[in-house]
């Protein structure tokens, strides 16, 4: 279910962008997600990396695209359209084109920030996951 985390990471960035663009404070958005059905490992693990602006370099866009490619190959046997997998693949391809294959996975969110002219920095003690 690795592809689920890719979809969730992109969706987290989109949700933050929609909220910020409509005047909702980022901390309020994040707390609302954590206290709703939107809560997930991705929300708790990835959001602080977005807030800190390092985008968690422990996993690259290139690795995301490799895994999404494998999922795409495996999905041919499903016999049904999988639009979320295609959408996630497209979002990560766009980010990789802009920032390079070695850029951190969460550059899929940075792309949204840059395109929309928004900042998802949030003051706080955001200890990187690899230092916890």
Residue ranges with predicted function:
Residues 1-115:
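Helical "substrate-binding/catalytic lid" subdomain
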Residues 119-132:
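ATP-dependent carboxylate/acyl-activation modules
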């Amino acid at each position: 279910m690795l592809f689920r985390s890719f979809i969730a990471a992109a969706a987290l960035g989109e949700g933050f962008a929609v909220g910020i663009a409509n005047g909702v404070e980022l901390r309020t958005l994040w707390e609302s997600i954590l206290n709703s059905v939107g809560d997930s490992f991705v929300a708790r693990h990835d959001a602080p990396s977005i807030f800190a602006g390092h985008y968690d370099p422990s996993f690259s866009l290139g690795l995301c695209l490799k895994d999404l490619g494998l999922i795409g190959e495996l999905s041919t046997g499903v016999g049904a359209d999988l639009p979320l997998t295609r959408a996630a693949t497209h979002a990560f391809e766009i980010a990789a084109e802009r920032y390079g294959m070695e850029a951190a996975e969460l550059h899929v969110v940075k792309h949204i920030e840059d395109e929309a002219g928004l900042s998802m920095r949030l003051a706080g003690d955001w200890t990187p996951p690899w230092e916890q």
